[in-house]
Amino acid sequence: MKTLRFALLGVGRIGKVHAKNIFLNPKSSLCFVYDINTKAAEEIANKYNAKLANTALEAISNPDVDAVFICTATPTHIDYLLMAAKANKSIL
């Protein structure tokens, strides 16, 4: 089985939990992290050896990403979901 490569959108409480779980799973890799709070996103990216995305679209559209974890505020979910669907990514 190949490694599942993730983009993580949002590094609040639940985003941090998912970042850690992705990191601890040997069959997954955290490739990109994005959050409107750049400093918080940078901390998580550095902690888990991921790249910091400047925009959600940058993370979602990268060809190295297989799936997108949407951990942002609920009102933003639909926009990110549509971006990920358009990019043909698995969505969590």
Annotated model-derived regions:
Residues 1-48:
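N-terminal Rossmann-like dinucleotide-binding module
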Residues 18, 50-92:
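Beta-loop-alpha module in the N-terminal Rossmann-like domain of NAD(P)-dependent dehydrogenases
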